[in-house]
């Protein structure tokens, strides 16, 4: 009898651990609008992919995919606004605890933009801003090769570690990253171009881990109720293009990327925010300054190129730089209006039918710069 009594707590404890063992969960969008959301997770053992969701812990709706896998991407519909969704995921006998995320609002939308995530700092300031969507301007990890081995293109371990660092943030806030050079560094860069490519231009690991719209290495996302379009471009280390240091897709006037962006900007939304991971002054001069001509149709551009906080302005177009590692060497834009040696992020706040504010904020929540933009 004593043996049975000792075993029962162990059995119950083991069952509880199994029921709550899935904890690497993140939310993304692969549609171009917020009508659906993708629930992503990692499981220790391969199995099916099941999401239970609803407006309460009783859930009420289920989406199941029967493929055997350890990385799971399940898209669920979002029919409601101005509320919170509850959800849990399961793979075989593995379970997650209940989690929640905010449905998109109908009055005021808050979006944060970060970059240069290699240091994994405290993001309490962003959590306190209670954002509806988290974006990046590239460099979401330090590199691939030191965790995965040189030349491994589809290894996702550094991205798993990013999710593990901020479990509550990623399971409660939709996340849409843009690409940087660090996101696809598969070999040491070295002091001169190596014999084999140092970067995976196709970004296989990034695309395997994140479910995003369009080609994933470039994407756009529309929040029509707020007349807002968000666009991620693939610009980084463009001076290395054509060498084994090349990191990004083509960007000349005949490139797929340029034609795609120009088409998006022919009938732009009232607000267009463009993200990338290259020096602003370099990007706007590409294709005989035709990129800048397209940016004139939007609201602002945001890069994570430099380790500093900055707002520049050219022909009325604001060019921002933000970095979570903002105390590095500064490379000011020739048209810089504000430059700060601060770890920072950018907060976009859009009032439905009204203006958009863009704030550069330090990680201690200090507002370094605030601008108001009207619809174009």
Place the predicted regions along the sequence by residue:
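Acidic, histidine-bearing metal-coordination/catalytic regions of metal-dependent phosphoesterases
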Residues: 18-113, 117-118, 349-376
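An acidic-aromatic substrate-binding cleft motif
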Residues: 96-148, 152
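Residue-level marker for buried hydrophobic side chains located in beta-strands
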Residues: 111-113, 134-136, 177-178, 274, ...
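Acidic-and-aromatic substrate-binding clefts and catalytic sites of carbohydrate-active enzymes
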Residues: 117-121, 212, 280-285
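Short acidic, glycine-rich surface-loop motifs adjacent to enzyme active sites
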Residues: 144, 265-283
